[in-house]
Amino acid sequence: MFRTAAGAVAAVGLAGAMSGTAHADWGRRGRRIPRQQLSIQLYTLRNLFEADLEGTLEALADIGYRSVELAGTYGRSAAEFRRLLDRYHLRATSAHVSFDGEDVDTLIEDAKILGYRKAACAYANYSTLAEWRAFADRLDKAAAAFRRAGISYGYHNHDHEFRAVDGVRPIDVIAEHTSPRNVHLEYDLYWVVEGGADPVEEYYRRFGRVQQFHVKDRGEDGGWADVGTGTIDWASLFRRTWAGPMKQYIVEHDDPADPLDTAKVGYDYLVDLRF
């Protein structure tokens, strides 16, 4: 799973060796990520968008991106932002959209205007299992409304969902208290590792529900790294998780020094990657 010994040592809590389906070799080598499944989470470039929204969208298109995952519309209406995406030949294939306390019908109408058919709740955190269960109930209800409108709504993890609360992991509460028909999972692979879990084992634990990957690398110091420059063995991970539904592979870095360089490094690495 890791490309260096230091990376493996840093990930204390991961299983030393993957077993069962995690060891399976899914056929031929040499696959590549189809470009239509390659995207970037625009949160990575949030500081640039605040200074120059159009110029940054154009720069992403020049790198080669054709799909993006939204994280807000930076003061524009859904229609205005859609026109900007169209101008630079970009397509919103997914978005992070909070539902708690929001008018879900309005969120759905905006999604239809912007054109995406996958959305996810970006964050939740609670201290008790009762709160997590109540959240899962609200999530399922909102996701059912999205589903009826033709949009798949999911949950995006951080690390804390993989750490037990009173003996139960919140990620398991979310998965077991929502319907697979309503709620898919968007696994942020950096945070899965940071939470002490094995991404491949977690993928097969919820096989069929994981429909999006946040492709975020982990440096030897445990911090964020540009995709392909850190310790996660992406070729092995993607090869072992190839089975199942078509997935979106979404480049992300939470705090890049040079967001456009990060975007280019991630795009070039994933386009060239063979597994």
Model-based region annotation:
Residues 260-275:
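C-terminal helical cap(s) of enzyme catalytic domains, especially alpha/beta-barrels
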Residues 46-51, 69-80, 96-104, 125-133, ...:
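Acidic-and-aromatic substrate-binding clefts and catalytic sites of carbohydrate-active enzymes
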Residues 149-231:
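Acidic/histidine-rich catalytic cores of soluble enzymes
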Residues 74, 95-185:
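Active-site acidic/histidine proton-transfer and metal-coordination neighborhood
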Residues 29-34, 57-62, 76-92, 103-116, ...:
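Acidic (Asp/Glu)-rich catalytic clusters
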Residues 36-41, 68-70, 92-97, 119-121, ...:
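Hydrophobic faces of well-ordered beta-strands that scaffold small-molecule active sites
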Residues 1-22:
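N-terminal export signals
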